Amino acid sequence: MRLWPAIAISLPRVTPPEGCEIDGSWVPGGTKVGVSQWSAYRSERNFARADQFLPERWLPEGEEESFINDTRAAFQPFSTGPRNCLGMNFARAETRIIFARLLLDFDLELLTGRDEWEAQKVYIIWDRCPLYVRGFGRQTRHKRPANLWLPWDTHGSSASNERKLADLLS
């Protein structure tokens, strides 16, 4: 989501009526402004080795020295403020479950090079090219918790919050 944000355009905001200063430049009131997520996420001002996929950059602060000065607040894939994405919490929960299932059950191998991804067309959203991945089933099963507590009550009873993890992920 950092290297290839879902939205390719900037998410607009309007400056206050009295105007304001943005990054050292005066902007008159009522002006539509925006920051490209792609530019912010690829900027060395915000992230060390910004063009590289390095998941260790997200480890808790202090664990990876080379990323200690990263501006993590610049990473806002769902926008920010009162008009941010309504589906943000659902998308994060869904992504965690899907990735957990994939990583527990498969060893993955990327089959295409990065060149195709660098040449993607963009309009308002990305015209994505396929990402070809080969999955190898794992021989050993990881021990999973028996139950998963969901943070919502679907039908008014607390019992409905408990779901078998195997059922949820199958």
UniProtKB/Swiss-Prot annotation:
Pathway: Secondary metabolite biosynthesis. Keywords: Heme, Iron, Metal-binding, Monooxygenase, Oxidoreductase. Its EC number is 1.-.-.-. The keyword Iron applies. The lineage of its organism: Eukaryota, Fungi, Dikarya, Ascomycota, Pezizomycotina. GO terms for molecular function: heme binding; iron ion binding; monooxygenase activity; oxidoreductase activity, acting on paired donors, with incorporation or reduction of molecular oxygen. This is Cytochrome P450 monooxygenase oryQ. PROSITE patterns: CYTOCHROME_P450. Heme binds at C85. Pfam families: p450 (PF00067). The keyword Mitochondrion does not apply. Gene3D superfamilies: Cytochrome P450. Cytochrome P450 monooxygenase; part of the gene cluster that mediates the biosynthesis of oryzines, natural products with an unusual maleidride backbone. The two subunits of the fungal fatty acid synthase oryfasA and oryfasB probably form octenoic acid. This fatty acid is most likely activated by the acyl-CoA ligase oryP to give octenyl-CoA before the citrate synthase-like protein oryE catalyzes condensation with oxaloacetate to form tricarboxylic acid. Belongs to the cytochrome P450 family. Signal peptide: none annotated. PANTHER family: BENZOATE-PARA-HYDROXYLASE, CYTOCHROME P450. Its cofactor is heme.
